């Protein structure tokens, strides 16, 4: 007679206490960076927000799942505290940050090198641009009350350059800051 077989359930990746504390700390830092970014002038409803730098560094360090967690937490805290955009802004915020950060972190996890970081970040910028162009085309007419034709005309002249510059600046900052920050986080 054979022993009863135990049913094995797929295990989730476990986070140790240090990882959870680091993610919480990075969430707080990302929120502060987002607050400081709000001090910069904005054009229409487009804001440069450098929290993606912190989110992506967290993802490079702890993986794409951590980047998604940090992104969701920061966007949720922002929605509850200072945002005037409500759930639509929350969704847009999470989509933009995850499109950039999770894409970059996933590729970096697979190709763990400087080349992988650059490739991941470049793909993250491309994903950010694609997602935000689609989101702006679909939601901005509803949210801002603009005719869809007006928004469609703004895609190549306003939204495309804005998101390319935003993604490019975030990419440059990450490439400069990643090694020193990661060295400090791993201590």
Predicted regions and their residues:
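Loop-helix junctions at membrane interfaces
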Residues: 1-187
């Amino acid at each position: 007679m054979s022993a009863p077989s135990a049913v094995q359930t797929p295990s989730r990746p476990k986070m140790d206490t240090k990882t959870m504390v680091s993610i919480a700390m990075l969430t707080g830092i990302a929120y502060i960076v987002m607050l400081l970014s709000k001090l910069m002038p904005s054009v229409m409803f487009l804001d440069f927000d450098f929290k993606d730098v912190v989110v992506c560094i967290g993802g490079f360090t702890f993986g794409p799942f951590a980047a998604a967690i940090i992104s969701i937490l920061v966007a949720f805290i922002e929605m509850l505290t200072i945002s005037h955009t409500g759930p639509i802004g929350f969704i847009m915020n999470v989509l933009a940050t995850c499109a950039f950060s999770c894409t970059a972190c996933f590729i970096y996890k697979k190709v763990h090198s400087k080349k992988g970081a650059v490739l991941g970040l470049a793909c993250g910028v491309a994903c950010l641009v694609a997602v935000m162009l689609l989101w702006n085309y679909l939601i901005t007419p509803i949210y801002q009350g603009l005719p869809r034709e007006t928004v469609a005309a703004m895609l190549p002249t306003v939204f495309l350059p804005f998101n390319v510059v935003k993604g490019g600046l975030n990419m440059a900052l990450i490439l400069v800051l990643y090694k020193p920050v990661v060295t400090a986080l791993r201590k």
